[in-house]
Design a protein with these regions (language model features):
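Surface-exposed loop/edge segments in extracytoplasmic proteins
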Residues: 95-103
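Short coil-to-beta strand junction motifs in C2/discoidin
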Residues: 56-58, 76-87
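Short amphipathic, basic-aromatic surface patches that mediate peripheral association
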Residues: 62-79
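Sec-dependent signal peptide recognition
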Residues: 2-10
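Short, solvent-exposed, Trp/other aromatic-anchored flexible loops in extracytoplasmic proteins
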Residues: 103-137
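Short, compositionally biased P/S/T/A/G/V-rich stretches that sit at domain boundaries
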Residues: 21-56
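Short acidic/polar inter-strand loop motif in beta-rich domains
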Residues: 134-146
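N-terminal signal peptide c-region/cleavage motif recognized by signal peptidases
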Residues: 15-17
Length: 176
């Protein structure tokens, strides 16, 4: 007798295998109303083309996973992605003078929305990572209700977060 096999069940069981291996950078940290996690993984192909550094010219895809906390005063539910933030990074390798800097782009992957960019590092070693998070700004951004009935609190001014990690390389793309 044949055992019935469920294709949806098989796909559900294989889904975790489709994720790239992420390397956490320290513990998530807090900005006012936000939790910010830092991770890296192998460089990522993106659409539209040209949005980020090419994978062939990059060592890692650096991400800031930014979610609302329970005490978020800007109207976001706990755990939800917060869009339209201005997120930048700087990386400094211990014992090296150059500082790598860049701006993150909002993007979405199979594990959800985040801010990120492909980055060329200065080789293996210990790195100091700084995220600078600024609130939405300008007309092309996220409007905020300010009336007494439906308004939300003003945005935070600026938030800087500091992480340290050791980069020893990553596995070959597709080898995860």
């Amino acid at each position: 007798m044949r055992t019935p096999f469920s294709l949806p069940l098989a796909l559900l069981l294989l889904t975790p295998l489709a994720h790239a291996k992420e390397y956490p950078i320290g513990e998530p940290q807090l900005c006012p109303g936000l939790e910010v996690g830092a991770v890296y993984l192998q460089p990522i192909e993106m659409a539209p083309a040209g949005m980020m550094r090419a994978t062939a010219d990059s060592d890692v895809h650096l991400e800031a996973d930014i979610r609302a906390t329970a005490d978020n005063r800007q109207g976001f539910q706990e755990g939800s992605f917060v869009p339209y933030l201005n997120v930048s990074f700087s990386l400094k390798k211990h014992g090296s003078d150059p500082e790598l800097k860049g701006d993150f782009h909002a993007m979405v992957a199979n594990d959800g929305p985040h801010y990120g960019d492909n980055v060329k590092l200065l080789g293996p070693g210990k790195y100091q990572l700084t995220f600078t998070v600024l609130p939405p700004s300008g007309h092309g951004s996220l409007g905020r209700h300010t009336d007494k009935e439906t308004g939300v609190a003003p945005w935070f001014e600026r938030c800087e977060l500091h992480y340290e990690f050791i980069y020893a390389g990553i596995g070959k793309k597709g080898g995860y």
